[in-house]
Design a protein with these regions (language model features):
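Functionally critical transmembrane alpha-helices in membrane proteins and complexes, commonly lining
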Residues: 6-69, 90-98
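Alpha-helical transmembrane segments and terminal signal-anchor/GPI-anchor hydrophobic tails
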Residues: 195, 212-285, 289-292, 299, ...
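Juxtamembrane "helix-exit" motif on the non-cytosolic side of transmembrane helices
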Residues: 32, 106-111, 173-183, 233-244, ...
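Interfacial loop-to-helix transition and helix-capping segments at the boundaries
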Residues: 43-56, 119-134, 176-200, 235-261, ...
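Aromatic-anchored segments of alpha-helical transmembrane domains
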Residues: 17, 21-24, 99, 103, ...
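C-terminal "closing" transmembrane helix and its immediate cytosolic amphipathic cap
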Residues: 267-287, 296-370
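Solvent-exposed interhelical
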Residues: 139-167, 206-224
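Transmembrane alpha-helical segments and their boundary/interface "anchor" motifs
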Residues: 48-57, 69-105, 110-127, 138, ...
């Protein structure tokens, strides 16, 4: 059995909770951006910024855990095996959850064409599922990325990451802001968004592979804290929900600093943490099912949010603030339970189907001489 890095599991669980927090708090934050109501917007804005390391952290963990050192060449057999794993672990569950969410949220308008029209187009059946299209696409290139980055020195990898950040994240953000203020610059100049997210994968590898000196860690922490403060302020200055949302993606600037600070903090403060076997087991299990938790959590948020609205629990911003922690906890627990049950069922069915296929294969294919 492969040894696990507990701090990576801790980071993944924290990122999962943060994603739930983002989709819970954002509804309230953007309610007060236009017209701007400073106090409630500031409170929800700061809380939302605190969680902005979540999605970039998922990409960074992908790089940290998959771009491993290997001298083995990429063969047709090895790549086929890798693709089968992607289909089993990512694609099939993604299709199942997308179909389930579609059936739950479109109870009176079911149709195959309706589902395909959503599923085969970005961002998918629900807006948060954009992540799946990007991460699956990146995964197809992971073996090649791994071979490529092995040929780079630490300095070369750092330079590559910085260049992509400049020509993707910075130019993209300048375009977004200039467009909002009708002074358009860098239109269609920035690198495609898929490159920006791939850069987060490379950044995760860099932070995992190389030691970051205490001085540089403090600098990154400072950039993260400054970004936490600046993000809601810049969003408020735009006074536009669409622009505000564009400024918090992993292809903009400030969330990268926030996620880098969070990633490094957890790596260096939790890498030697000692927890009881029971707590470790729970964290590991929550980490293993976090992918399924991510897929279902928005549906649970919508159900609970609708319930609170119907029972007049969210009439004022103070009501919303009071109920926010409860929403996050309830959604995380319910989503995790559903994810756990799905994982058990999915493992059972795939094991049974695999055994059935093996049983019906010719003896020669199984390596038998008879």
């Amino acid at each position: 059995m492969k040894s696990r890095l507990l701090w990576c599991d801790i980071l993944r669980v924290i990122a999962t909770i943060m994603v739930i927090s983002i989709h819970t708090i954002s509804v309230y934050q953007y309610t007060y951006i236009k017209p701007l109501q400073l106090l409630p917007y500031s409170i929800f804005g700061v809380l939302n910024s605190l969680n902005r390391m979540a999605v970039p952290a998922f990409f960074m963990l992908t790089g940290a855990l998959t771009l491993k050192q290997t001298k083995k060449p990429i063969t047709r057999k090895s790549y086929t095996y890798f693709i089968k794993n992607i289909i089993y672990r990512l694609v099939i569950p993604f299709i199942i959850f997308s179909l389930a969410v579609y059936l739950l949220t479109n109870q009176h308008h079911w149709s195959v064409t309706g589902f395909l029209a959503l599923f085969l187009n970005y961002p998918g059946v629900q807006k948060h599922m954009w992540f799946m299209y990007v991460i699956i696409m990146i995964y197809f290139f992971i073996p090649f990325l791994g071979r490529f980055v092995q040929s780079l020195s630490r300095h070369e990898l750092k330079l590559l990451i910085c260049l992509i950040f400049i020509f993707s994240n910075i130019l993209s953000e300048l375009f977004i802001l200039s467009k909002h203020y009708h002074k358009m610059v860098f239109n269609e100049v920035a690198l495609p968004y898929i490159i920006a997210y791939t850069n987060l994968v490379l950044l995760g590898l860099y932070f995992m592979k190389y030691n970051i000196s205490p001085g540089k860690r403090r600098l990154i922490y400072m950039l993260g804290i400054i970004s936490l403060i600046l993000l809601p302020i810049i969003q408020a200055l735009t006074n536009n929900v669409d622009v505000a949302k564009d400024l918090i993606t992993g292809r903009s600037v400030l969330p990268v600093f926030i996620s880098s600070a969070g990633f490094i903090f957890i790596k260096y403060h939790f890498s030697k943490v000692k927890l009881s076997s029971c707590v470790t087991k729970v964290i590991t299990r929550l980490s293993e099912i976090s992918f399924y938790t991510y897929l279902i959590h928005v549906t649970i948020i919508d159900i609970f949010y609708t319930y609170l609205l119907n029972h007049n629990r969210l009439n004022t911003w103070t009501d919303q603030l009071i109920w926010t922690p409860t929403q996050i906890v309830v959604v995380f627990i319910v989503s995790s339970i559903i994810a756990y049950l799905f994982d058990k069922l999915y493992r059972y069915l795939t094991k049974k189907s695999s055994a059935l296929i093996t049983r019906h294969q010719p003896a020669k294919q199984l390596g038998n001489s008879s």
